[in-house]
Amino acid sequence: LNEKDIAADAAQACKEIEQGKLLVDSGRSLIEAGLQKTRSLAEEYVLRAKALMTDYAEPRRFELACHAYEQGIELTRANLSEEELAKSLFEYGCFLQTNKRYDLAEVRYRENLDICQRLAAISPYAYEPDLATTQNNLGLLYSDTQCYGESEEMYLSAVEIYQRLSVVDPRVYDPDLARTRNNLGNLYRDTQRYGESEEMYLSAVEIFREL
């Protein structure tokens, strides 16, 4: 090849690169638009679920609301991030727990817990608060279903996380630490471990007084 041919090929290569960049940019825009649409649709499923629960004339309102939540979760699972999936699972778990469907709530919380543990291993400060919140809710769930050993395990794990976080930002995390210790105090009281119950209550009261 002579110099002229090389220059022509180089110009063509540059042109192809620029065309490729345009396609990539266009593709990114389409992907981002699709993700935003998916987020909106997932949120619409949640809003539908909440609206269904206010329709007291509908005998199947709970079943229909669950279906709407599950549709939103599967849409999120297929298209969005693990972080967004974890949030959807947590919200559905709270809904089920509030409606005393503890078996179903446990399944969703446990899946959320697995995701939060993976994310927290990579970025503790970003995801440990969500992990502790799920553990606290599971502690409440297990306490309500008389699974006291599992409840204590979850509460203690949450307390450990909140203690670390409160050292960094007490204003934000001291209330969570106090509430979880109070929940642990309730658990020890219900299982007649009164000395440990008193210890947890007193530590919670001390934190609340300082808020």
Regions found by a protein language model. Give the residues of each.
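Long, domain-scale regions corresponding to catalytic signaling modules most often appended to membrane systems
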Residues: 1-41, 55-58
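TPR-repeat structural position
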Residues: 7-10, 20, 58, 62, ...
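Alpha-helical junction/boundary sensor with strong preference for TPR arrays
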Residues: 21-27, 31-34, 38, 52, ...
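Residue signature of alpha-solenoid helical repeat architecture, marking inter-repeat boundaries
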Residues: 36-43, 63, 80-83, 122, ...
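Conserved positions within tandem-repeat grammars
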Residues: 118, 124-125, 129-132, 164, ...
